Amino acid sequence: MNPERSERIEIPVLPLRDVVVYPHMVIPLFVGREKSIRCLEAAMDHDKKIMLVAQKEASTDEPGVNDLFTVGTVASILQMLKLPDGTVKVLVEGLQRARISALSDNGEHFSAKAEYLESPTIDEREQEVLVRTAISQFEGYIKLNKKIPPEVLTSLNSIDDPARLADTIAAHMPLKLADKQSVLEMSDVNERLEYLMAMMESEIDLLQVEKRIRNRVKKQMEKSQREYYLNEQMKAIQKELGEMDDAPDENEALKRKIDAAKMPKEAKEKAEAELQKLKMMSPMSAEATVVRGYIDWMVQVPWNARSKVKKDLRQAQEILDTDHYGLERVKDRILEYLAVQSRVNKIKGPILCLVGPPGVGKTSLGQSIAKATGRKYVRMALGGVRDEAEIRGHRRTYIGSMPGKLIQKMAKVGVKNPLFLLDEIDKMSSDMRGDPASALLEVLDPEQNVAFSDHYLEVDYDLSDVMFVATSNSMNIPAPLLDRMEVIRLSGYTEDEKLNIAKRHLLPKQIERNALKKGELTVDDSAIIGIIRYYTREAGVRGLEREISKLCRKAVKQLLLDKSLKHIEINGDNLHDYLGVQRFDYGRADNENRVGQVTGLAWTEVGGDLLTIETACVPGKGKLTYTGSLGEVMQESIQAALTVVRARAEKLGINPDFYEKRDIHVHVPEGATPKDGPSAGIAMCTALVSCLTGNPVRADVAMTGEITLRGQVLPIGGLKEKLLAAHRGGIKTVLIPFENKRDLKENPDNAKADQDRHPVKNNEEEQTLSLQNYPSVFLFFFFFFFEAIEAFNRFTAAGLKIACPAAILSLN
């Protein structure tokens, strides 16, 4: 029976290579040919409908009218995304089969006049039998073909439309292009199901043959492995019988190594006892290999070897100052240690923990400390470590056991007193294999690490001469472990510090790394400051280094393309030519003063950050809503701030009954990021006052502090990081709790000079400085009048209503 035909359509045509799209099929396509991209753009400009037609030959790059099949699928474009390499990723959904009656090429893209193909009338009873058989056969095919997930069968059972069922089965079959096209051209559903069942029967036969071959190969491999094992056993027996005379030479060599290692008495006795066991064993036995490996580790570990520690304070200070700009507290602590060491023969190595955001130089500082003290440097990355055996090692009862990473690193460095960097100590975790943080308690305790016990060595090892330096991004470290370390906080760099670091270290390093010659590139201070302000917003300097590296790469490309160019100078005026548009604003969190929007300050594990808080008031019944992934403490801060506003409503010029007639919504943007803590209390209070009075908040002011029900502002933590975040953002006025005034001494001098910091005791002081116009009693009468107008309008029939200009809301 010929299929019924519906109305004609005119539609853009997209040629496909090796792909046939069926109706109801959602598939992503990557389009690279210019004509095809123009076809997609034409479809997007019209009704997002496009006809997908397969090419007869996939190798044809520029297909003509005769290179396409005549039957395709009309599809809807769900999503279109242009990729950086010029190609386009498009997500399409097949809608209905269609046959091309006339295909034309207008130079821009293919266009066709086509007509939809409708399914003919069929015998429903016969179709029901075919559907059941097809599903059953497809289930058997899935059991043999492990590449198709079982969930496909579940979704197949939920499909009621036989045509859609047939197309879904066809989409999951590994058919050739011609077979896929044949299925597409079959408008008769029964014919399509019969064709697919025949294809499935053929595929099932092939898969069964493949399974039998795979089983035969597996048996053959097992036989080969057994023969190999027996041959190796035979070789071992022959070698044991014929080469027993060579064993004493190896034992003598191990004896000499034990004597030369200068082990403590306990360790030497253990090593010699193991050597005696080895002499009694067959050299080729598995146990002999384990014992030999143990003795090798015992003689590799440095029991007595030390590197000479430098005691010249002046030289050490020069090294630290040369390698790192700023970080005075850490440098002072190292110099104190060296000063004491110059007077005391035996001093336990300090255990320092450098805590700070990424990119401030914690890891590189460990290398500089090793260089300044004359110690060898060894680093152990603890990020992701979750097995206690990584620290303590495995017992020798396990196959393939080894010492822990700690002893392995000590054996590798070869001395007893290195600088040992424990990197990312806060990134450790635990599971059923133990807690590595608990294993480190013994390592980092100066009173206990003189006798550190490794499960593999089974003897005590002295770690008291090791200088341990740990690094961490946060204080999220178990309390007992934190108590054993001397914590030194590293805050983010100021703009002046970043400028000096870039000039001294980052720029010369990237010029050398990108093979630029002397005099070929000049980057002045204005360009570096522009990068810091408008292209990075970070506590450290990693992003700054990446941007400088980008400048160097573009300079190299420019020099190679233009041979006449000998020198490139980058300044603040032409910086955007190399780095593109500015990514960040500098000077304020927003461009203008806004009602109900406040800039707060937040502390994160990677340093401080600006936190925008938004409020909105709408007519309602007193419902309070807060969004933005806020924690319990932050939600309670909002409730406390609202109570403060209600208690002072008349004084602030707010109708005391506002809570009964207004719904309030508090939102903190970046809702995917969890936020918590009480330090946004005064910011919440100010946002509510601004929203209820219509008084804008100054965009150049940021604030932090906890609010009480009495309106008092309580002290907060992380002040230095928050002030540096405001400094990075160009905020000139910062409001802080009065009791945090003492913490201002720890802030860098240049940051102090660029910021106006106001310690405040209560919300009235804070709102006087932050609101564009401080609320007055006049506003109370205005809002009372405004509420009366609203009440009158609600009860007035359709007709004349009293208007209240919104502009009056900002009057004081």
Swiss-Prot record:
It catalyses: Hydrolysis of proteins in presence of ATP. Transmembrane segments: none annotated. The keyword Nucleotide-binding applies. GO terms for cellular component: cytoplasm. Its EC number is 3.4.21.53. Its main location: cytoplasm. InterPro entries: AAA+_ATPase, ATPase_AAA_core, Lon_bac, Lon_bac/euk-typ, Lon_lid, Lon_proteolytic, Lon_Prtase, Lon_prtase_N. GO terms for molecular function: ATP binding; ATP hydrolysis activity; ATP-dependent peptidase activity; sequence-specific DNA binding; serine-type endopeptidase activity. Pfam families: AAA, Lon_C, Lon_lid, LON_substr_bdg. Residues 745-764 have a biased composition (Basic and acidic residues). Keywords: ATP-binding, Cytoplasm, Hydrolase, Nucleotide-binding, Protease, Serine protease, Stress response. It comes from the Bacteria. Residues 745-766 are annotated as: Disordered. SMART domains: AAA, LON. Contains an allosteric site (distinct from its active site), whose occupancy by an unfolded polypeptide leads to enzyme activation. The active site is at residues 679, 722. Residues 11-204 form the Lon N-terminal domain. ATP binds at residues 356-363. Residues 592-773 form the Lon proteolytic domain. GO terms for biological process: cellular response to heat; protein quality control for misfolded or incompletely synthesized proteins. ATP-dependent serine protease that mediates the selective degradation of mutant and abnormal proteins as well as certain short-lived regulatory proteins. Required for cellular homeostasis and for survival from DNA damage and developmental changes induced by stress. Degrades polypeptides processively to yield small peptide fragments that are 5 to 10 amino acids long. Binds to DNA in a double-stranded, site-specific manner. Endogenous substrates include the regulatory proteins RcsA and SulA, the transcriptional activator SoxS, and UmuD. Belongs to the peptidase S16 family. NCBIfam families: lon, PRK10787.1. This is Lon protease. The lineage of its organism: Bacteria, Pseudomonadati, Pseudomonadota, Gammaproteobacteria, Enterobacterales.
